[in-house]
Amino acid sequence: MKSCGSLLTPLYRLPSPLGPLLLAGRGGWLSGLWFEGERHCPMSHQAEARSQCLALEWDGAHAAVADLPPFVETTLQWLRAYFSGLLPLPPLPDLNLRGTPFQLAVWRELLDVPFATTLSYGALALRVAHRLQRPSVGVRAVAGAVGRNPVSILVPCHRIVGARGALGGYAGGVERKVALLAHEGKCADGRDVASSDWFFGCPPQ
């Protein structure tokens, strides 16, 4: 993961089982992945600009009509495996994230939270403090950085929960957080992942 020269303007729009996703990046580097309408997405409230994004197909049919950069293909491969419950997941695309040193430290720690597990904001704060070689960091500051994670799902901020298992917030909507955690639990248990399980309806066509 690197942290310079990020391209944060979404260029692609992809249907998913939990609603449309917006992708940003350049070359082999993914710099942004947001649910449409998500807080902190650079274009969440600019319908005209969003309409200019290149529409992608979930099944890869777009490949015949578009010369896509590598980050798009690797991101799609990962997302299709994730939502299909195909474990182990393929490698993540290379990430090029833009944020403060503190935010980057938080996002790096998010990458270490395993699939189908959760971690409290307080426990995450301890890990961030260790990474930054500080005695402590504020839990609220950590929560703020989690909320501004620019790569949903792949950088798994949905696995961070409140004290005593309370869900806490999620920039993409708490309903999606519930759905993602439930999905990962079923995959880890070896249960079949059916399209009807998805909170937001049918899988992408």
Show which residues each predicted segment covers.
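Charged low-complexity interaction tracts in eukaryotic proteins
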Residues: 152-169
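DPxDG-like acidic metal-binding loop motif
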Residues: 146, 161, 171-176, 181
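Major-groove DNA-recognition helix of helix-turn-helix-type DNA-binding domains
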Residues: 145-147, 153-154
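Basic nucleic-acid-binding alpha-helical/helix-turn surface characteristic of O6-alkylguanine DNA
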Residues: 1-133, 183-205
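Short, positively charged loop/turn segments that connect secondary-structure elements
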Residues: 129-144
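Charge-rich, low-complexity intrinsically disordered segments
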Residues: 165-171, 176, 189, 193-198
